[in-house]
From Swiss-Prot:
Its main location: cytoplasm. It comes from Rattus norvegicus (Rat). Keywords: Cytoplasm. It is found in: Cytoplasm. This is Fuctinin-1. It comes from the Eukaryota. The keyword Metal-binding does not apply. Has a role in the physiological regulation of fucosylation processes. Residues 1-22 are annotated as: Disordered.
Amino acid sequence: SASPGLPKGEKEQQEAIEHIDE
């Protein structure tokens, strides 16, 4: 889902954004 190399918190935030976008 999120790009590799991102911090855990940022990964969770990115996934949340994807859910909102969907």
